[in-house]
Amino acid sequence: MTHTLRVIFAGTPEFAAAALAAIHEAGFPVPLVLTQPDRPAGRGMKLQASAVKRYAVEHGMPVAQPPSLRRAGKFPAEAAEAIELLRATPHDVMVVAAYGLLLPQEVLDIPRAGCINIHASLLPRWRGAAPIHRAIEAGDAETGVTLMQMDVGLDTGAMIDEARIAIAPDDTTATLHDRLAADGARLIVAALERLERDGALPATPQPADGVTYAEKIGKHEAALDWRKAADVLARQVRAFDPFPGGVATLDGAAIKLWAAEPVAARGDAAPGTIVEAAPEGVIVACGAGALRVTQLQKPGGKRLPAREFLAGSPLAAGQRFALPDAA
């Protein structure tokens, strides 16, 4: 099926690429794609295109990569050029998903039908950069995707639609991301079809209560503080998969922990102490309870099940992981 509604798309990572693919496959014309500039990545630190750029190029869509859209920012000339390109590109609506650049009011006002954002939380909870990570870290029972009509605030726009999903006890940011990306793709296609048919999308202001902010994840957060409760640490491990991982330091070596579950305490060992190193998992004493770690990674190595990790890197009861302020 082909559509006449013309969609400019702005996004950067895989979450956004899923939405762009759905829009394209549904038959909506995409006259322009905005994505962040290529960035150095990987061990070789070679420039790599974003997931959105890769999809757009593969499917013959024009791509622009301005470093900013703010005339008053660090790149005023590039921003002005990008804004003129937006004005010169015939379109009806802009869809924004995990773009990573601020859109000033001048840009929001360009599309006839405004800008629709796909946000990976149930707004107003978890506005901001890392909603999936923070929902898992906080122990939320559910999360979802919200479509909103963008305004200049940080994820403060009126809500068009949402989809809710339960957070499973073994969900990681990686697994939850994929389900939310699929839901976001489905929601935006349905919304664009309604917009094309009806000419407008009803939207409801966000409630004033229940606002929380999902701060960007920093590498410094990876260190596990064994003085915390085991269930808190288990959520941290799941929330930080695939980035930045949960890090435990032993004899100066940073070991990444990728899968763990809380278990009952074993004795009265000090937090961070290994109380058992078995093929089924490495059990570590915590501030409350204990953590059974079932997947580990040594520096320069691969993620391994506990059984394989211990075969190559033996651990023993009585060894103690460093506490963050002592690492």
From Swiss-Prot:
Record field: catalytic activity: L-methionyl-tRNA(fMet) + (6R)-10-formyltetrahydrofolate = N-formyl-L-methionyl-tRNA(fMet) + (6S)-5,6,7,8-tetrahydrofolate + H(+)
Enzyme class: transferase
CDD domains associated with the record: FMT_core_Met-tRNA-FMT_N (cd08646), Met_tRNA_FMT_C (cd08704)
PROSITE patterns referenced in this protein's UniProt entry, alphabetically: GART
One Gene Ontology term, aspect cellular component: cytosol
Assigned keywords, A-Z: Protein biosynthesis, Transferase
Enzyme Commission number(s) from the entry: 2.1.2.9
Gene Ontology molecular functions: methionyl-tRNA formyltransferase activity
InterPro entries xref list: Fmt, Formyl_trans_C, Formyl_trans_C_sf, Formyl_transf_N, Formyl_transf_N_sf, Formyl_transferase-like_C_sf, GART_AS, Met-tRNA-FMT_C
Family statement: Belongs to the Fmt family.
HAMAP family associated with the record: Formyl_trans
Protein name: Methionyl-tRNA formyltransferase
UniProt organism field: Burkholderia vietnamiensis (strain G4 / LMG 22486) (Burkholderia cepacia (strain R1808))
